[in-house]
Amino acid sequence: MSPQTETKASVGFKAGVKDYRLTYYTPEYETQDTDILAAFRVSPQPGVPPEEAGAAVAAESSTGTWTSVWTDGLTNLDRYKGRCYNIEPVAGEENQYICYVAYPLDLFEEGSVTNMFTSIVGNVFGFKALRALRLEDLRIPVAYVKTFQGPPHGIQVERDKLNKYGRPLLGCTIKPKLGLSAKNYGRACYECLRGGLDFTKDDENVNSQPFMRWRDRFLFCAEAIYKSQAETGEIKGHYLNATAGTCEEMIKRAVFARELGVPIVMHDYLTGGFTANTSLSQYCRDNGLLLHIHVAMHAVIDRQKNHGMHFRVLAKALRLSGGDHIHSGTVVGKLEGERDITLGFVDLLRDDYTEKDRCRGIFFTQSWVSTPGVLPVASGGIHVWHMPALTEIFGDDSVLQFGGGTLGHPWGNAPGAVANRVALEACVQARNEGRDLAREGNTIIREAAKWSPELAAACEVWKEIKFEFPAMDTI
């Protein structure tokens, strides 16, 4: 063997495959304030020890690969590697473990949710040694939080822009979601807004289809906003969906919305992508637009209990990427959402600081420092009988969005909006008077219906409508 090709053990590199746990399982590690911490629910393949599975997650989502490579000697792996520092079995589940992994901050580009997720929830989710893998929670260190702009404006600035305080905001998604012409769509918006709603909304499917091009929709909705504002004396808005096939087209639509003088635009942030969302959020901050975020596609990622990513992680990512509203489930409506878990990530959206609380699924204490809060949006299968529960569960800093619960009113859109506004005002007044909304909710609605024929009609239509299915995702 020639000197040029000879290898020596003393060089420090030995080819071959070694157990991940020898390098990446470090139970003695003390986490740093600057580490990104992740809690993974790991289901190893039969015969794979949990320590090896947890170490494999840490390795494959940071510096590791399947074999030893000589270029490991050209860097400081102890500085850059992820570390599985704790493993605990999941109570009541066989062969499932919560594996805690710490990532040094230098692994991630500043201000990039895209880069963070590419590492933490990248190829490792297809790793054969694991039957399933789910990211349950992240702790984003303050040092990394400060590299993001966050929401364009936040809760307090939005209230100041709208001049609306002391109650949840009311919205409505226009139905049918597809097929209306732009003029009829604008008419539906106008009827809802003049009836007492604060917002109407494009459905997530509405972009720029042959039956209704985006520019026509924007124009007719702007007309509805200004006409209803003139009649009611209240500031109104419509979530104009700027989501498009390219970032350039998305920004063009947002620019047109700004030129029309409307207060808010909308983005489907998962189908549109985090890079596009962050760009739109920064444009909205610079140009005074509020940004409503829809979560279409989230259930593909978060619905399964043992694989994917929990919605609380998506919510944290959105607060970093930027959005003033985000759909968060209803607890009482037609969409998935267990109460304690939902309130856990609602607090993560709104509060500056959230303590670790495993009873609500919060694995880490999280500080958002000066990052503005995000309004949770309760939407999906809700109607006037749900109003007391929604007011009690979500409080004032929320948006309650009734699509079918407005447009399905037997007398039309405007009476449907009146019914929802009367029900909301009655619940807020009762709460402020010290009444128990959880116990007296139905009585409060019936009392208000005596003075509002619109509410009485709504109560009759939806008196037996319930969505009582168990949540799939529980603690």
From Swiss-Prot:
Annotated positions binding substrate: 123, 173, 177, 327, 379
Modified residues (N6-carboxylysine): 201
Miscellaneous note of the record: The basic functional RuBisCO is composed of a large chain homodimer in a 'head-to-tail' conformation. In form I RuBisCO this homodimer is arranged in a barrel-like tetramer with the small subunits forming a tetrameric 'cap' on each end of the 'barrel'.
Organism of origin: Amaranthus hypochondriacus
Cleaved propeptide residues: 1-2
Keyword annotations: Acetylation, Calvin cycle, Carbon dioxide fixation, Chloroplast, Disulfide bond, Lyase, Magnesium, Metal-binding, Methylation, Monooxygenase, Oxidoreductase, Photorespiration, Photosynthesis, Plastid
Function: RuBisCO catalyzes two reactions: the carboxylation of D-ribulose 1,5-bisphosphate, the primary event in carbon dioxide fixation, as well as the oxidative fragmentation of the pentose substrate in the photorespiration process. Both reactions occur simultaneously and in competition at the same active site.
Domain of life the protein comes from: Eukaryota
Binding-site residues, Mg(2+): 201, 203-204
Annotated positions of the N-acetylproline modification: 3
Major enzyme class: lyase
EC number assigned by the record: 4.1.1.39
GO terms for cellular component: chloroplast
Self-association state and partner proteins as the record states: Heterohexadecamer of 8 large chains and 8 small chains; disulfide-linked. The disulfide link is formed within the large subunit homodimers.
Record Gene3D superfamilies: Ribulose bisphosphate carboxylase, large subunit, C-terminal domain (3.20.20.110), RuBisCO large subunit, N-terminal domain (3.30.70.150)
Protein name in the entry: Ribulose bisphosphate carboxylase large chain
GO molecular function: magnesium ion binding; monooxygenase activity; ribulose-bisphosphate carboxylase activity
Record has Transit peptide as a keyword: no
Subcellular location: Plastid, Chloroplast
HAMAP family: RuBisCO_L_type1
InterPro entries: RuBisCO (IPR033966), RuBisCo_large_chain_AS (IPR020878), RuBisCO_lsu_C (IPR000685), RuBisCO_lsu_C_sf (IPR036376), RuBisCO_lsu_fd_N (IPR017443), RuBisCO_lsu_N_sf (IPR036422), RuBisCO_lsuI (IPR020888)
Cofactor dependency: Mg(2+)
